[in-house]
Amino acid sequence: MRLQYFGHSCFRLISDTGTTIVCDPYDENMVGLTMPRTRTDVVTVSHHHADHDCTTNIVGSYALLDCKVTCACDDIAIDTIETWHDEEKGAKRGADIVFTFVVDGIRVAHLGDIGFVDPHVVKALRGFDVIMLPVGGVYTVDAKAAAELAAAINPKTIVPMHYMTSAHKFTIGGLDKFIAEATARGWTIADNGADTLRLEDAPENATTQVVVLQQFED
């Protein structure tokens, strides 16, 4: 399985047989990053804000999943967990859907714009192999809450997302605060400039590892 980072909260998952899923594609005019133009079998949308649901650069035919669902796309099993975009159960920013995938035997979760440490989500995801985790705060959990959420889930690998870069057109927290939280917890930090994580090649660590991915460019 390969996991490619398209920037902001967008990723492409590719199974060994070539089945593809794109999570949370964004409006590049709103975000400030260049959203790669791509084909895919499935698009998942955690919630309908323009930095998570813009399919302008998705070409060809695909299935769009934006609600509670349990299904499969060829060799990828897909499930959902309903949660909230904020700590007031959606009163501020509405709902959020966590999408989970089983790809080549690897359990992966995209947490969308989760806004608080939700015990229901923690219980459902505990022991997952990989989580894609927002860390920038303002509209999601901040660095400290993200670290608390990750520690409770205890995945093998965390891939940070939804954090400030020099290209962003709106202000959220940067990656550095989350890296500081992760380092304080003794987690391994892998930041080698890669844009793709090959899960079958990931080393088995005694502690959780944080993998920082660069934006993928076709």
What are these regions (language model features)?
Residues H52-G105, G186-T207:
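Metallo-beta-lactamase
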Residues I21, V42, I106-V108, V130, ...:
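Structural motif
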Residues R2-Y5, T20-D24, A77-W84, V98-T100, ...:
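Active-site-proximal beta-strand elements of phosphoester/diester hydrolases
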Residues D41-S46, P134, I158-H162:
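Short internal beta-strands
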Residues E87-I153, F170:
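Active-site-proximal loop/helix segments of hydrolase catalytic cores
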Residues Q4-F6, R93, T157-D218:
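Binuclear metal-ion centers of metallo-dependent hydrolases, dominated by the metallo-beta-lactamase
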Residues S9-H48, H52-D66, E82-D96, I114-A124:
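Pre-active-site segment of Zn-dependent metallo-hydrolases
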Residues H8, G18, D27, N154-Y163:
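Internal catalytic or translocation cores that form aromatic/hydrophobic pockets or channels
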